[in-house]
Amino acid sequence: MGKITFYEDRAFQGRSYECTTDCPNLQPYFSRCNSIRVESGCWMIYERPNYQGHQYFLRRGEYPDYQQWMGLSDSIRSCCLIPPHSGAYRMKIYDRDELRGQMSELTDDCISVQDRFHLTEIHSLNVLEGSWILYEMPNYRGRQYLLRPGEYRRFLDWGAPNAKVGSLRRVMDLY
């Protein structure tokens, strides 16, 4: 079970809302979000309702202002708890749509897709085990996308505007 608390003001001040499960619409509970405390679990928060817009991965810890989670604004409108995973992590990445082309397999974090696989774009992928976060830039920076087990036949399937990928990280409570 997870627990996340959203605060309207920085430094955990102002009106707050505690959440322990997925919530597709946080708008009724607060008008803005400037700080977050994650007491347990790993979470993905979204700038728009229904898990749309920019995504941000949060694990246990304190985030006293939205820059701490690399947010672009104080708008957080939905969240989901990422189920814990205790087994192996495995993903296949492809340089073409529809799970075609050059295939490479990952079982651990990748700080630079370009350095490791000589790719700057991933056009499709298949998450076989565990949940992952895809980052548009190396060193786990830039836009983030949650990848749960399943096939993603094109970059639009994971919500990206293009196939640019810089790094990939396993969703784990501790790093």
UniProtKB/Swiss-Prot annotation:
Name used for this protein in its record: Gamma-crystallin B
Keywords, comma-separated and alphabetical: Cataract, Eye lens protein, Repeat
Domain Beta/gamma crystallin 'Greek key': start-end pairs: 2-40, 41-83, 89-129, 130-172
Short name of one Pfam family: Crystall
UniProt keyword annotation of Hydrolase present: no
GO cellular component labels: cytoplasm; nucleus
Location of region: Connecting peptide: 84-88
Organism whose genome encodes this protein: Homo sapiens
